[in-house]
Regions:
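N-terminal small/polar-rich segments of proteins
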Residues: 2-138, 182-215
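C-terminal structured domain segments
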Residues: 138-196
Length: 215
């Protein structure tokens, strides 16, 4: 019988073990027979599939694009960028062939915006080009940068063979493996005179889909 305290140590993934039993006529006697039992278990934890941000633990991260005003070289311009550490937990011990990831902004109309770009908006609420700062996103998957166009799904192949990261997720006591997927956000250089001075804000929405055909 497996005690509940031992069961609690099993995290999502594939587990295997071998039990060997030897039959003797008495403790000091020779072996009469040997029995071997192979165990192969797949533990799933779909309800805890999670997009995890290690630096923010269990809170929604607040991302600063670090946009700076640069007077030189002339004419003055603004640009910026930042990185966001992210790890994807599939609830299956990363035993699946792929994950699908989609990143989008809050979907406001942005006429004239370059294809694939995401946006933040001036706090005053304007909708013109001068009230919008655009940025691009790339996702590093196994050392390969993948461009994450706005509301376009990227399929991350080879989840079951890629390098994994051991983390303790919020609400869990045992470490699990997740897929490192850090993001790089880049605000390209634009003329400072083309944008309103002040505070810009917006939302970045990240969605992860786990294939339904897995165990």
């Amino acid at each position: 019988m497996l005690e509940s305290s031992e069961l609690a140590k099993l995290v999502a993934g594939r587990w295997d073990a071998t039990l060997e039993m030897t039959l003797r006529s008495h403790p000091a006697g020779g072996e009469l027979a040997t029995y071997k039992f192979a165990f192969d278990l797949t533990i799933t934890d779909r309800d805890r599939a999670n997009i995890y941000f290690p630096a923010s633990d269990n809170i929604t991260p607040l991302v600063n694009l670090n946009v700076a005003y640069l007077p030189v070289p002339s004419p003055p311009h603004v640009e910026g960028g930042t990185s966001l550490d992210m790890c994807l937990y599939d609830g299956l011990g990363s035993q699946i062939p792929y994950l699908e990831v989609t990143i989008r902004d809050d979907g406001k109309d942005a006429p004239g915006r370059a294809p694939g770009m995401h946006s933040v908006w001036h706090h005053a609420g304007g909708r013109g080009d001068d009230s919008r700062l655009d940025y691009s996103i790339t996702l590093d998957y196994g050392g390969v940068p993948l461009k994450m166009d706005n509301n376009v799904t990227q399929r991350l192949l080879g989840i079951d063979t890629t390098q994994l990261r051991l983390v303790v997720l919020p609400g869990m006591s045992q470490p699990v493996y997740c897929v490192p997927a850090p993001l790089k956000l880049t605000v390209p250089r634009v003329l400072a005179s083309s944008k309103l001075a002040g505070y810009y804000e917006g939302r970045m929405i990240i969605e992860m889909v786990v294939p339904s055909s897995t165990p």
